[in-house]
């Protein structure tokens, strides 16, 4: 990383308007409750449009019919996307049945969307149904607090069903970190759960009265799997085990992928190592990292407000020293660890606890009854008989976890009956991913989720033609440069530029530790496929044994590696 660290600890200047909004929100209340009772519009007005994000929702509309409604002098068809807080992605079959029923009866699209942040989203909830959605989550033992905006978002944890004891310990820490960093305001309970207002003054001892400068993402990672893509996250705890038991964490900070087209002051960044800590220091270090970013993060320019820019401004050594001072903990040298991959192991695996775990490939994470593929009904049928739990993965798949040997056949029979298991799915498709994008995401510049399935079919044909049809390239599509599809950690990454046009990035690796460089800018699908055809042909003919596509692209000089993204990402 860059060694040019000479910036101020605190950026002075006129604060971004989001800071005013938070300051005036009365600890995230705003006038959301009043807006809920306004039947003249299906949306939220003014500051509430942004404040609801702290409560786990985004106001969206169906962009496919936006122009048509405008011609009819109608407002956009406003509906909310609601995202659950589900640290580690673990939920019970009973919780699944509850959300399945709600999605079918109370959303415009009838689907459950598993996200690459290990939770689920409802798309298309009308304003009149929002309170019942939050109350349903509460009844199920869930909530949507702090799954969006300037807070610590849903905490990820490696979906490792084989190392059952280690996973259990890591998962417990993911939950504890999530709970420790939650907002303390009672606004969520008052507005959505109709709990009484209390006279006590709100305080936010960790997040502060204006919360964080920007969104903040955290992971707990169990090597050698990097399924959570730690380098896309602000704060990461890499599990270090001794004889199968968790003893501590290597802490890495400052990863992030969001950029803005045309703004070279924005760039992706991999996370930097702070050092090793024993498990008993985990919450103290987590809090210290968050409060340091709270106080030092840029509140004048939201495009430069994330932790990665704070590190580039003040330097990793200065940041580390401040975290140590606040936590009263001194980092030890980083313990050895390595990553070998980040894909999910689709199909059955047996854990050391003798339980079986079935990972189901869910293309794009969209659980819906498709013609001939009634996935949503199938998941509900499995939930009715499953005695273990469900684990949502950061690759948008679902694990039916903790299956006893005697129950394995009945679970598999249902999975096959409802097309949740398909032996014909290629390795390439399993290693391809897209964000939601159009028609619901207001930031989308190009298609992603709707684009990916057929695009992968074209890539599969190219792979077969070059004799590598049984192999895979980590392929990701994100509909805009905000990076939700994590394309800037892929071997082939497409970043939406306009309808039908993408920037093509090459040179990431399978382990997710290298940022790909832009190879072609603003090109069409046909142009992308021509480029991929030529490049896969070279890879198939010239690669070294076991050399991944991204590694080949670097070695062959097709693209130069991104070594210091603050300086060379745009070179």
From Swiss-Prot:
Coiled coil start-end? none
How is the co-factor bound, per the entry? Binds 1 siroheme per subunit.
EC number(s) per entry: 1.8.1.2
* Biological processes, Gene Ontology terms: cysteine biosynthetic process; hydrogen sulfide biosynthetic process; sulfate assimilation
Q: Which GO terms describe its cellular component?
A: sulfite reductase complex (NADPH)
The EC class name is oxidoreductase
Tagged with keyword DNA-binding: no
Gene Ontology molecular function, alphabetical: 4 iron, 4 sulfur cluster binding; heme binding; metal ion binding; NADP binding; sulfite reductase (ferredoxin) activity; sulfite reductase (NADPH) activity
Name the coenzymes or cofactors required. Answer: siroheme; [4Fe-4S] cluster
Name the chemical reaction catalysed here.
Answer: hydrogen sulfide + 3 NADP(+) + 3 H2O = sulfite + 3 NADPH + 4 H(+)
Q: Which pathway does UniProt place it in?
A: Sulfur metabolism; hydrogen sulfide biosynthesis; hydrogen sulfide from sulfite (NADPH route): step 1/1
- Identify the domain of life: Bacteria
- Where siroheme binds, per the record, is at 484
Stored InterPro entries: CysI, NiRdtase/SiRdtase_haem-b_fer, Nit/Sulf_reduc_fer-like_dom_sf, NO2/SO3_Rdtase_4Fe4S_dom, NO2/SO3_Rdtase_4Fe4S_prot, NO2/SO3_Rdtase_4Fe4S_sf, NO2/SO3_Rdtase_FeS/sirohaem_BS
Q: Where does [4Fe-4S] cluster bind?
A: 435, 441, 480, 484
- Keywords for the protein's UniProt record, in alphabetical order: 4Fe-4S, Amino-acid biosynthesis, Cysteine biosynthesis, Heme, Iron, Iron-sulfur, Metal-binding, NADP, Oxidoreductase
Function, in words: Component of the sulfite reductase complex that catalyzes the 6-electron reduction of sulfite to sulfide. This is one of several activities required for the biosynthesis of L-cysteine from sulfate.
Protein family according to the UniProt entry: Belongs to the nitrite and sulfite reductase 4Fe-4S domain family.
Checking PANTHER family in the record gives: SULFITE REDUCTASE [NADPH] SUBUNIT BETA, SULFITE REDUCTASE [NADPH] SUBUNIT BETA-RELATED
Quaternary organization = Alpha(8)-beta(8). The alpha component is a flavoprotein, the beta component is a hemoprotein.
The record's listing under NCBIfam families reads: CysI, PRK13504.1
Recorded protein name is: Sulfite reductase [NADPH] hemoprotein beta-component
Q: Which organism is it from?
A: Musicola paradisiaca (strain Ech703) (Dickeya paradisiaca)
Q: Which gene encodes it?
A: cysI
């Amino acid at each position: 990383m860059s060694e040019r660290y000479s910036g101020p600890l605190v950026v002075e200047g006129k604060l971004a308007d989001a800071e005013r909004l938070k300051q005036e929100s009365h600890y995230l209340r705003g006038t959301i409750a009043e807006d809920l009772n306004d039947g003249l519009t299906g949306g939220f007005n003014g500051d509430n449009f942004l404040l609801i994000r702290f409560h786990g929702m985004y106001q969206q509309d169906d962009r496919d019919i936006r122009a048509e409604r405008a011609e009819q002098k109608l407002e956009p068809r406003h509906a909310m996307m609601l995202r659950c807080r589900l640290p580690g992605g673990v939920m019970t079959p009973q919780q699944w049945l509850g959300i399945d029923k709600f999605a079918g009866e109370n959303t415009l699209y009838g689907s459950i969307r598993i996200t690459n942040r290990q939770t689920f989203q409802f798309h298309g909830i009308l304003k009149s149904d929002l309170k019942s959605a939050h109350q349903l989550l509460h009844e199920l033992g869930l909530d949507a607090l702090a799954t969006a905006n300037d807070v610590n978002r849903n905490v990820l944890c490696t979906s490792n069903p084989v190392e059952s004891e280690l996973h259990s310990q890591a998962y417990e820490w993911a939950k504890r970190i999530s709970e420790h960093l939650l907002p303390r305001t009672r606004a969520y309970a008052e507005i959505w759960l109709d709990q009484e207002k209390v006279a006590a003054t709100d305080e936010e001892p960790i997040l502060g009265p204006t919360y964080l400068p920007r969104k903040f993402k955290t992971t707990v990672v169990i090597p050698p799997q990097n399924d959570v893509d730690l380098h896309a996250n602000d704060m990461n705890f890499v599990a270090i085990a001794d004889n199968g038991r968790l003893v501590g964490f290597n802490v890495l900070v400052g990863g992030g992928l969001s950029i803005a087209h045309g703004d070279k002051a924005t760039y992706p960044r991999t996370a930097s190592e702070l050092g090793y800590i024993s498990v008993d220091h985990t919450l103290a270090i987590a809090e210290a990292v968050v409060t340091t970013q709270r106080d030092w993060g840029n509140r004048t320019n939201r495009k430069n407000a994330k932790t990665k820019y704070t590190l580039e401004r003040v330097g990793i050594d200065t940041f580390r020293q401040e975290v140590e001072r606040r936590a009263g903990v001194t980092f030890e040298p980083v313990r050895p660890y390595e990553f070998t991959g980040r894909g999910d192991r689709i199909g059955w695996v047996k854990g050391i606890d003798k339980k079986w775990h079935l990972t189901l490939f869910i293309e794009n994470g969209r659980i819906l009854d498709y013609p001939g593929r009634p996935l949503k009904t199938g998941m509900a049928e499995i939930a009715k008989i499953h005695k273990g739990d469900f684990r949502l993965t950061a690759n948008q798949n679902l694990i039916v976890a903790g299956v006893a040997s005697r129950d394995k056949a009945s679970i598999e029979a249902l999975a096959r009956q409802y097309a949740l298991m398909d032996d014909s799915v290629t390795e390439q498709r399993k290693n391809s991913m897209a964000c939601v994008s159009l028609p619901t995401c207001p930031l989308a510049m190009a298609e992603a989720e709707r684009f990916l399935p057929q695009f992968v079919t074209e890539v599969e044909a190219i792979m077969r033609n070059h004799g590598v049809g049984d192999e895979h390239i980590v392929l990701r599509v994100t509909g805009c440069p905000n990076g939700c599809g994590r394309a800037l950690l892929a071997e082939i990454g497409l970043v939406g530029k306009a309808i039908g046009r993408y920037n093509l990035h090459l040179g990431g690796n399978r382990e997710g530790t290298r940022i790909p460089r832009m190879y072609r800018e603003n090109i069409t699908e046909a142009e992308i496929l021509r480029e991929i055809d030529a490049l896969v042909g070279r890879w198939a003919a010239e690669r070294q044994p076991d050399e991944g596509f991204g590694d080949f692209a670097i070695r062959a000089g097709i693209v130069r590696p991104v070594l210091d993204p603050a300086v060379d990402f745009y070179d």
